Amino acid sequence: MSRIRLVDSVKAAGUAAKVAPGDLERILAGLPRDPSVEDRVIVGTRHNEDAAVVRLPGGQSIVQTLDFFTPIVNDPYHFGRIAAANALSDVYAMGGEPWCAMNIVCFPVKRLPESILADILRGGSDALREAGAALVGGHSVEDDELKYGLSVTGLIDPEIIASNAGLRPGDHLLLTKPLGTGILATAVKANWPGCDAHEEELFRWASRLNKGAGRVIRELRLKAATDVTGFGLGGHCLEMAGASGVTVALDTAALPVLPGVTELAGMGLVPEGSHANRAHCHKHVHVAPGVSPVLVDVAFDAQTSGGMLLAVSPDQMDAATTLLAETGDPAYPVGEVLKPLPGGVRLLLR
């Protein structure tokens, strides 16, 4: 039997299928808030955070998130692991530890065999086991397009929360995974020459848990972090800069890039979601003369289960890189936090 190409069954792959940031911003702006329950919300929707932090009776707090998307790879087990790793990342990004999770399934039962879904769920279950989180249920609907993800609940110390609003001038920025998953996923979906190798590289990185980075946040009590996903490194930096009232400077020549990504981007294999990210951000971005247009595309590439971006003070750099090395995670220095630049520039690509 021929191999089923899951990516051919969907319009857009992975986090590139997200609603464009500008559209989402307009939609959410009209949602009302309920003042009667605001006192239980420690971190909510104000700064586009990775997850919510909610206060419970008795002094405990939980972190909650959900994430689901369409396939970015063809192997169903790999897709399940990637989707679970991506959902877990939001908990790690806040400084929490995953506790339990529930599956979210949209499945075309008339077009794909049940074995596909079984393998997807097995991949998700294995990722949760690695994270030490319990799978406690889920919900499924029949859909024209395959989608999978999880709702994750974690435990968190309310005194140790990393947020988008915690950047401070002088902080160094460390990234824990190379960039380019959106571009590789585009090549896989296009069945581009060499796409099997691209798919293996994609799985290798996108299935890695950001567990080690979460440990760094807790042990060093970091104030700012985010996982780099659908809005790209540039888009997430812009969110953090706006929430913190600072400017973020990214050193484009230092950006870690997955094998083959720059060549593919140079040929125009950039997902539509990445173009939307760049268009949404352009008013607050300054690109220095001489910066490669391809690296600008990489900076805004819509990542799926990307790395953690950690804001680390100069005196914490050695400790952060040591802790990451202990769990086998890279620590790529990609930029720094500056005082606000004139003209509303929140992101400098230099």
UniProtKB/Swiss-Prot annotation:
Pfam families: AIRS (PF00586), AIRS_C (PF02769). Its cofactor is Mg(2+). Binds 1 Mg(2+) ion per monomer. Mg(2+) binds at D50, D90, D227. SUPFAM superfamilies: PurM C-terminal domain-like (SSF56042), PurM N-terminal domain-like (SSF55326). It catalyses: hydrogenselenide + ATP + H2O = selenophosphate + AMP + phosphate + 2 H(+). It is an enzyme of class 2 (transferase). Transmembrane segments: none annotated. The record marks K18 as: Important for catalytic activity. The active site is at U15. Keywords: ATP-binding, Kinase, Magnesium, Metal-binding, Nucleotide-binding, Selenium, Selenocysteine, Transferase. GO terms for molecular function: ATP binding; magnesium ion binding; selenide, water dikinase activity. GO terms for cellular component: cytoplasm. InterPro entries: PurM-like_C_dom (IPR010918), PurM-like_C_sf (IPR036676), PurM-like_N (IPR016188), PurM-like_N_sf (IPR036921), SelD_I (IPR023061), SPS/SelD (IPR004536). Its EC number is 2.7.9.3. ATP binds at K18, H47, N48, E49, D67, D90, G138, H139, S140. HAMAP family: SelD (MF_00625). NCBIfam families: PRK00943.1, selD. Homodimer. This is Selenide, water dikinase.
